[in-house]
């Protein structure tokens, strides 16, 4: 929806990431250890699944919380809305800070395998701070909660969990995730001032209203 110069500059918006030895980094390390403990649990399985943003990964992640399957076939307008937001949230809202700090990811710093080893080669070339996955998940949750207000609690909780999954996977620090939510919130505010986004959002709301009236929403 947006061009790079239309999005809040994450480098100006965010503080620098915590440095090793600081109290903030000690919390990052504690959360990393917490995340490792979750990997052998059902929550760890969810975290690994949340790492997949390709194809229908994002829409599938939010379908249960949203109350109806989000897909090209069943909810084309809603699907288009959240799909078009992905680059805005995951790239544009995080790019400046990511490129400037190029923060080393947890699995690299601690010399341990992440929960998604197949993605490590690419992740190693991409800065850890802030988290793009988190930004996508939180921005998506904010917009879906606006469409289906009756399930805002479930949707926002799922969006929060989506970010925590990155800590569990060992590919982001907690501070990366927290920062991802900040830039995502700023992005959604800016999207609401964009005519193209507002037009698509209106289509998505109209589509949802019809589905709800037809009794197809939980």
Features from the language model and the residues they span:
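Catalytic phosphate/nucleotide-handling subdomain of diverse soluble enzymes
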Residues: 185-187
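Primarily interfacial, aromatic-capped hydrophobic alpha-helices that serve as membrane anchors
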Residues: 203-218
């Amino acid at each position: 929806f947006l061009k790079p110069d239309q999005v809040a500059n994450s480098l100006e918006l965010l503080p620098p990431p915590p440095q090793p030895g600081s109290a903030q980094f000690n919390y990052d390390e504690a959360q990393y250890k917490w995340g490792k403990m979750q990997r052998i649990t059902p929550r760890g399985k969810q975290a690994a699944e949340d790492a997949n943003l390709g194809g229908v990964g994002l829409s599938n992640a939010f379908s249960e919380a949203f109350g109806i399957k989000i897909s090209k076939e069943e909810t084309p307008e809603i699907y288009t809305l959240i799909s078009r937001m992905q680059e805005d949230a995951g790239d544009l809202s995080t790019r400046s800070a990511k490129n400037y700090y190029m923060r080393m990811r947890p699995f690299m710093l601690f010399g341990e395998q992440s929960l998604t080893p197949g993605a490590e080669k690419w992740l190693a070339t991409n800065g850890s701070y802030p988290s793009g996955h988190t930004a996508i998940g939180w921005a998506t949750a904010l917009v879906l909660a606006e469409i289906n207000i009756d399930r805002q609690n479930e949707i926002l909780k799922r969006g929060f969990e989506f970010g925590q999954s990155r800590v569990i996977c060992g590919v982001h620090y907690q501070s990366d995730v927290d920062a991802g939510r900040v830039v995502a919130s700023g992005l959604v505010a800016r999207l609401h001032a964009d005519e193209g986004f507002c037009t698509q959002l209106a289509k998505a709301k109209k589509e949802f209203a019809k589905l709800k009236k037809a009794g197809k929403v939980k």
